[in-house]
Amino acid sequence: MKVLKKSNAVFVMIMVLILNIMSVSATELPKEAVYDLKKGGTQQFILQDEEGKVTEVVIEEITTNARIANGNYKVSYKNPGIWEAGFYVEISANKIASAYSPFHSVATGMILYPNLARNSETKVTYSFLYKQAASNYSTGVIAEMSGTDLVVRQK
């Protein structure tokens, strides 16, 4: 009987440790992706949105130029099982020269009123209304230049 109690106690302690580790790692996820233009290539990020849902951002370099911080990049933001949205940006001299070809797809619900805007030479916003069943909310993707980094987050 003592052996059974000890093994149960050990099992409970192990489960508590595992659950604590899982909750700590979930709270440590960033809320925005920081793409390093100097590194280039394709960079993938796992984020956590304001509601605690895990999301994914993929930023992919489209062209390679001799000068650092020049080029075209595909920005893709995924809410797994819900929606994916993004756009392309052209960067020149660490500034956003243009934003073009917005795209989106949905697993459930629908996206209404999509709008891609270059707010300034350092910021682009792709806004839309996401509608699912009886609920809807305004959301989207924001990309901003910060030095030689392209910072992406959910609107």
Q: PLM features: what roles do these ranges have?
A:
Residues M1-S76:
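N-terminal prepro-regions of secreted/extracellular proteins
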